Amino acid sequence: MRIDNLVRITQGELYQTPSIAQIDGVSFDPDRVKSGDLYICKNNSQESLKKAISSGAYALLSEKTFDVTDKEIAWIKVEDLELALIKLARYFIATNKIDSYLINPKEKLIFDALSKPKGLSFIENSLDKLIESFFNSKKTLVILSENEDTLKQIAPNYKALPTCNEEVFISSKSLFYSTFLFNGKAFNALPISPFFIPSFVKVLFFLQNFEWSFSNIKPLTHFRAIFITKKFRMLPFGMGEKALIVEENLKLFKEEILYLKSRICQKDLLIAAPKSLNLEVDFEYDALEEIFNLDTRFKYILLFANYEDLLSLFEKKDSNKELTLF
């Protein structure tokens, strides 16, 4: 990109007229700057600017007034760096006619669990990686994000993933594995709950537009089960008739409540969550350890908690049990 275009798009102030006319790439890390790069300084550090120059940066973008130490470098100051990045993103998206999609948490989980074709850029809370991909010759075909506010700023014409109208035949009684038929292909005993299958199919339908084929799917990091005994001892996966289903995403937790209530008899299901969430559930707790006092006549307990924290509690409980035996 030419320096004069960069200044115009970001509405920045160029501190002098350097002999360098354009940049070849971009970096947000002074330690990763290459010769010809634009260094975008988010920490407003003069030391970071000096390091970027010594690494070969051709241009510097910052919202801090800096000491110009090299007359051959394009020093560009903006009033608001985040706003400047939004303007850059909007420029690239508009000029390259890049499609943008708002995805929900379930769809994002499916994307994360699959191998993905080249050209998909996922935005979370920062535009850094997207800006780097634009400048560093990584062709972006599609932008996807759960963050609607960000999409409104950089791609106001964003869409939802297209809906697949093809009927999906699900023949799975398990809560944790799925067998179904879609688009003439049988998917047998996939390690995901039927709860996620509509989203899974939607993502598959979307990915058919790319050079991509399904190979496998990694276990999802939500709606995770811990099988237990009546005395709350952990069992290997699938080896018991009772299970804790653990979720830490509040939006998914609320959806999972409705799903489980549609699949399980009321007498077999208990919903538990921290008191701080102020939800209408069967059991509220202040400390996660309190779940060990629950009545295990229930077959399934949907629990709002961090999975790793819960595993640590079980390990501690088992360790204390072993110590009392000696």
Task: Show where each model-derived region lies.
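Predominant activation on well-ordered alpha-helical scaffold segments within soluble catalytic domains
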Residues: 86-90, 200-208, 258
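Conserved beta-strand scaffold positions in the cores of enzyme catalytic domains, especially
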Residues: 75-77, 100, 119-122, 157-160, ...
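N-terminal leader/targeting and accessory segments in enzymes
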Residues: 1-86, 226-233, 237, 246-326
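Extended acidic/charged loop-beta regions that coordinate divalent cations
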Residues: 146-187, 224-240, 248, 317
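A short glycine/serine-rich beta->alpha loop
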Residues: 43, 186-194
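Walker A (P-loop) phosphate-binding motif
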Residues: 87-147, 191, 230-232, 239-250, ...
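Short, polar loop motifs at secondary-structure junctions
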Residues: 60-68, 106-108, 127, 145-150, ...
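A conserved, hydrophobic alpha-helical segment in the catalytic core
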Residues: 191-224, 298-306
